[in-house]
Amino acid sequence: MEQPTKIVSVAALPQVRVLGRTTGTDVVNLFWTGSGIEFIYTGSEIQVAVNADYDAYEPWLAVELNGVQIGRVPLNKGKNEVCLFRGMTVGKPKHVRILKEVQAMHQDPGHLLQIVGLQYADGEFQQLPEPKYRLEFVGDSITSGEGTVGAIYEEDWISAFFSAMNTYPRMVADALSAEYRVVSQSGWGIVTGWDGNVENKIPPFYTQVCGLLTGERNASLGALQDYDFEAWQPDAVIINLGTNDATAIQSAVELGQEWAGTRDVEEVKEILTTAICDFLKVVRNSNPTAQIIWGYGMLGDNFLSAIREAVEGYAEQTADSRIHFLQLPDTTPDTVGSRLHPGMKAHQITAKEIETYLQELL
């Protein structure tokens, strides 16, 4: 058995598919959850070389072999060489996917994950089959996979309790033989974050590669650049936003406080409706032919009717028959995960609902 030799950059391997909204060529910068690389390799052993860094929240990497997850590792600061498999049959194709498990970390400018290259010796790379569809998922902590790992009673907000592999975006994409990308941030919403911080909202950053990141290094890596929508047009965009808005607004109501300068819930709904319509316009302009599905309800139905009416109203006003609202299954005591978030079972149930809905549309 030959030993792995030099590290070869992904740019030098055209058979390797880069996943997610990324930047870089020789070194691939992974920002969002679910970003990574995918390839088919015939050798007995292969390693991936990555650079990692963080101040508070370390990046985690998931390794999938022939459709089954075989590894999940936290990464140390600096250079890491992760063996993906060793001692397997030479000449037999192995389908490998490596995914970033942790979301883009807005509150940790030191958070970094880069794929430097692959190290191998005795095999060849084969062409991947073309994905049947391209799907984009936009959301909050649910879409980021918060709570899909860990015991139910866990409350600490740490990287370990996030997982791209255990989320409905990955499940839906795999069921439909699709390539997917994710734009999501825990605690963020349409018009406000869970704590009432109106700066923490996804829509203003949608048209950038990963504009919600902070720090000079992220800027230098291209996170704040305009995203090239034409280079990767999705067949469907699935949005799951509103849970954090509902939390913030309901908290203000219960405490008798103003939100956005008003105590009038109907005025708040108008603000929410306007923001939803504005965001749908941006998503449609960016993805002219995509089916757009706004899903909601995995953590309760507060403001569900307002969100549904906003989405369906916009579709009607614009005569856009490719915009839809889908009520998602609520999380139950049997399907809850850590941090009082939907667990993997909840994601499996939701994934099936979205998969079935997409099959009717695509």
Regions found by a protein language model. Name each.
Residues 169-179, 279-291, 314-320:
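A structural motif corresponding to the C-terminal end of an alpha-helix
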Residues 134-138, 143, 180-184, 235-240, ...:
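Structural recognition of the beta-strand scaffold that forms the well-ordered cores
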Residues 272, 276, 347:
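Aromatic/hydrophobic pocket-lining residues that form the small-molecule binding cavity
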Residues 32, 148, 154-265, 298-308, ...:
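Conserved SGNH/GDSL esterase-like catalytic core that processes O-acyl groups on lipids
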Residues 126-128, 223-233, 281-287, 360-361:
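Surface-exposed acidic, glycine-flexible loop patches that form ligand/cofactor-binding
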Residues 291-338, 345-362:
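Extracellular serine-dependent O-acyl
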Residues 1-164, 362:
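N-terminal secretory targeting modules
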